[in-house]
Amino acid sequence: MTAPLPLAGNLYENMDKAAAYGYDAVEFHTLPSFHFEWERIKHMRQQKKGDICMLVTGRLYTQLHYCLISDDPENVKGAISGLKAYIDQAQKLGVDIVLGWVKGSVPQGGDRDIYMARLADGLSQLNDYARSRNVRIMIEVINHYETNIFNTAQETLDFISTHALDQCYVHLDTYHMGLEEMDPYEAIHLCGKKLGYFHVADNSRRYPGSGQFDFSRLMQALADVGYDGYVTVECLPEPDRDTAAKKAINYLNACEPKSC
């Protein structure tokens, strides 16, 4: 199975490559133990040869198998500890973190209330820790074929509001929105100022402009709510990584409001 990442491999090479293609920054999928070359990053930023916009925490779940709603208390502790390590890294980089897979999924036949209470407890701890580090947590909204928690913008917003998670924001992705939202553009308006991060791919999950998604309406909706964060391409690397990355940025640049 192919991961939906247009660029992969060495962080610093891809920062440089992305900058050459016209991107402002890259998001970085890594483990919490990754050792950054801080001076190298500082130099690249100064020379405008690449930047990092976000840390993605999925490998804490997919590789280390930690989960915020695990039935094993030690596993939950490991998830929280790992996420705190990501937050520490994000603070040093001056970026935020994405929280997606590590939230887990309620097992079949499980008592949803118990698991959601466990998730609320873990996220409350992380919310407080992130506030102390001036880092925001972007909770990714993922389709129901992949998880059964936070499938829509409304569900995610309600959870954030109910548990007063002031450092947590909604992270939307056009691919998942196309599967879950009755009106993807209205979902953006619904989030408003609580929209913290945004992924784009076309309806087939290939690069923007390759399918049927209306990116002119999308960009206008983002402008309507005053979204000033990153719009990050997360698409399948087809027909190849470099072509997907180039075609995506060229198309999106042409789709600024009133220009598409």
Label the predicted regions:
Residues 1-4, 29-31, 57-60, 102-104, ...:
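Active-site beta-loop-alpha junctions enriched in small/polar residues
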Residues 1-91, 165, 249-260:
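N-terminal pre-domain/capping segments
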Residues 5-19, 96, 124, 150-172, ...:
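Histidine-acidic metal/acid-base catalytic patches
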Residues 9-10, 69-169:
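Active-site acidic/histidine proton-transfer and metal-coordination neighborhood
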Residues 27, 54, 98-99, 138, ...:
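Conserved beta-strand positions in the central sheet of alpha/beta enzyme cores
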Residues 35, 62-63, 107, 140, ...:
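Generic structural signal for helix capping and beta-alpha/helix-loop junctions
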Residues 40-49, 119-130, 187-190, 217-221:
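Catalytic-core regions built around general acid/base machinery
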